[in-house]
Amino acid sequence: MTPSQWDLPVELCCRPMAFVTLTGLDVVYNAVHRAVWDAFCANRRADRVPISFKVLPGDHEYPKCRTKRTSYEWYIPKGILKTGWMNKHLNLVPALVVVFYELDWDEPQWKEKQSECATRVEIVRQSLQGRNTKVAVVLIQKKTPLPPGEDVIASERAAALCNACDLSGKSLFVLPHTDHLVGYIIRLENAFYEHAQTYYYTEIRRVKSHKEFLNKTTHQLLFVRHQFKIAFFSELKQDTQNALKNYRTAYNLVHELRAHETNMLEIKTMAGFINYKICRLCFQHNTPLDAIAQFRKHIDLCKKKIGSAELAFEHAAWMSKQFQAFGDLFDEAIKLGLTAIQTQNPGFYYQQAAYYAQERKQLASMLCNHDSSVVYPNPDPLETQTGVLDFYGQRPWRQGTLSFDLSDPEKEKMGILSLQLKERNVLHSELIITLLSNAVAQFKKYKCPRMKSHLMVQMGEEYYFAKDYAKALKLLDYVMCEYRSEGWWTLLTSILTTALKCSYLMAQIKDYITYSLELLGRASTLKDDQKSRIEKNLIKVLMNESPDPEPDCDAAAVKASQKLWSDRVSLAGSNVFTIEVQDFIPFVQCKAKFLAPSFHVDVPVQFDIYLRADCPHPIRFSKLCISFNNQDYNQYCVVEEAYQKSDILEQSSQGTMCLVPGKTRKFTFKFVAKTEDVGKKIEITSVDLILGSESGRCVILNWRGGGGDAASSQEALQAARSFRRRPKLPDNEVHWDSLAIQASTMIISRVPNISVQLRHEPPALTNEMYCLVVTIESHEETVAKDVKLTAGLKPGQDANLTQKTQVTLRGTDTCDDSFPALLPDIPVGDLQPGEKLEKPIYIRCGTVGARMFLVYVSYLINTTVEGKEILCKCHRDETVTIETVFPFDVAIKFVSTKLEHLDRVFADIPFLLMTDILSASPWPLTIVTSQLQLSASMTSVDQLESYVENVVLQTGESASECFCLRCPPVTNSGGVATGCYIISWKRSSPVESVPVVSTVITLPHVIVESIPLHVKADLPSFGRVRESLPVRYHLQNKTNLVQDVEVSMEPSDAFMFSGLKQIRLRILPGTQQEVLYNFYPLMAGYQQLPSLHINLLRFPNFTNQLLRRFIPTHIFVKPQGRQADENSIAAA
């Protein structure tokens, strides 16, 4: 039997489809026939009926039909299912044979053509030899047929043709060869499908009829066979629900069969076939849980049915194939839309398949381990006359034998031997690797990283057993990183051991050294004697010698590798290996630590390198060197020691570069930083520890940064969380876990020895030239050279502050937006020891709020460090926050001549502009002057003068001004610009040079309206009781029209009056009329005047309410005074 016997048959795994053969088509030489065939087969869409087509000649011989049994009473079956039965009904025995014939209804030679067609049909029937296969005829015609019933000739000839061919009307079809060929073909397919359905239905009934004659005593195998056939025919009929039902019945019947070593393989084979079908249909019906449940049941029922103990590897192979097949089904269902999860995906089944393949390998190594003198039996017990088995699952040397007793034990023994010898040639590792690879792909897809890593390790080990060491090393190397990062030290040690063997057998020197370094380290769980052996081998490699073989390696592979190692020794190639230890865990640990996070440039930079070895024996290194981001410092940080090659493994702890296991060794370095590195970070980019010498092989252990390896971060975290008290060590020793890596330090400038003081009077006032006095005093012992001052707004603040802040050195300057916010590098000169100087800075702040100002003083000075003179740049900076406030608030309002608030003014009517300046400054303010600048649309009634000139305002005090203005008529209806109000002010200070600040306040716009009539009243400021009070009213026409005015006077209780009580006037455009009244006050006090009422006939909207804005309504009346006579004076 061949190894492929465990593969499921192709006819079992494919989707069963109705088989239809097409005859009468010449697809090679006839273009019409070729077009018909392509329409049937090419580019079939998923929605077309499931039919398998095949073109055969008309006289093709189909498989012969055996004579049917009339009784099963004495019939004893020889097996369950014949190996060719499924293929026969899928590809050999058609459900329908279609005869294609070119014949039109108007064919002149109709009789001859009809007879020829009938002959072809009869030949097909003869070749089917009594099978139930349906026969149909398709007439290929050139013309499109008329609708049914309209072509009488066609109907008559169709009936005649059916009669001649012995066909029903449903079995005769017409295929016009037109542009719509595909559409006709699809309709033909549907008709063919119905005929095929009928055929398979008939076959199912035929098989069921046989079951009536069976008994369970001698026909147990037939029960299974018939039930399988019914299910298979149901699948061909596309009745998958009934197919699943019958497959389940067949599966139960299989397990009811009596099992013995002789028929165990046949039972398992058929159980596997039927289980595959059940699971496939469950996935097809979208019931994956039923498929999984069926498969678990199948495995539980079959895993104990091992069969012959001498062929136990066959059971493992069969179990492996069951899991692999189910995994394939599961994966196929996922590709068709099924959703899987992490805990239930095909990977688990591929993994189990791989485990059984590994078990098969182990059993084969035990059972097939025959002596080389054992030869393969002759004749071959596995050969058959036909080259294939008659029944699935039977032994070739006893086919059809149902007896449990072996009639020929010697033949059985030879058969088992041949199977064992063939199994010995199977490449088990390839099978295992393929299955593991499938499982890895699934676990990667469903994001199961640990399962993926676990299986990759097994793949690597399997490659190792298959002697493909390069692939093994590649896989193991990939997985090591994950186990290192998670701290699985035992697993890591096992993987490293296998990797070391691979690198040894391939004579890969660098890999061998790398894995040896890690197996000697603290992460390795090897025993000390194993570590000692590895350490000695490592030293041999470094001395350019061949290492001793690794234990448990294949003898032939070891012999080949020793030759490779000898070749490596003799080659005069590069013997320097640089190993980046950041990604693994070597036996030497390294930590670099600067003594401080920053150093002044005039102080030597100092740092320590701590080394610790974890190998079994003391080991001597040849060189230690440190690299920095500035390579100029590398030359100062090197330790080197020469020794003989034989002294690498040093038993004593003497020597500068000798590391004793478990002891921490410290190396101290110092150097003077360069002045150009001030403000920069000095970083240790790498630490190189060199093992070996140039005369042998040299290994450079390279730590990136300040040391640490793949386990350092995890160990540091554990140490930080640990509450365990550390034992006390001698003064010159430290706890390794307590050391923290400090791989960088800052070089900062020398500490300045000058003082900077700032003097000012906060807060600052908006737009004033605020004075900030900077006082610099030197306390240096030598001259401070090239002193420079930078002053202004500190960078990094709001951009709006930068735009609204200006700095200058001269207070008399008028700052605008062109002045900077920061004055850099103002030269001051040299400062002698103890010398002091002052520098005033003037700042203009255009907006309120807090600002941070920077004063930065830098200078150069000579100093000596470690006997080396350097020029240091020192600096001192001071910051101060200055609050800016408004100096005053200005209130602007418009009022009438009666001092009433105006929300709008009237053209050519005088009104008042009132300003009120309220001091908000904590310091006294001097208002130097004020100025009103009117716009072109506004005029002044009188001379504009400042009434607040040289007024000093304390906090909270205010100063007011009043201006009488007039606005000419305007054309637009919007607001009119008034102008601006300019206040010139400064802080009140005895210093005359305090600059004056001009603050411009834009006056609000006013709405100007025109009125048709303006009324002005001339009357005294007060009246007296019973004294005449003359009042004159001026009525001025403000329009271009003649105004008809009705004037009336409404009396008051406090006055009598003389004049016209009611009058009608006509006022010409631009002119005025006067109306004169004499009022006679009757009582003292603030009395209401008689009311003047005006009615404009052309402007009915002109109201008296508007009139009252222009004329007074009340007047103060004094009491009547006594006349001074002599008597009264005397009495007084």
From Swiss-Prot:
Keywords: ER-Golgi transport, Golgi apparatus, Transport. It holds the Pfam family Foie-gras_1. Its main location: Golgi. One of its GO terms (biological process) is vesicle-mediated transport. Disulfide bonds: none annotated. The keyword Transport applies. It comes from the Eukaryota. One of its GO terms (cellular component) is Golgi apparatus. It is found in: Golgi apparatus; Golgi apparatus, cis-Golgi network. InterPro entries: TPC11, TRAPPC11_C. Belongs to the TRAPPC11 family. Involved in endoplasmic reticulum to Golgi apparatus trafficking at a very early stage. Component of the multisubunit TRAPP (transport protein particle) complex. This is Trafficking protein particle complex subunit 11. The gene is TRAPPC11.
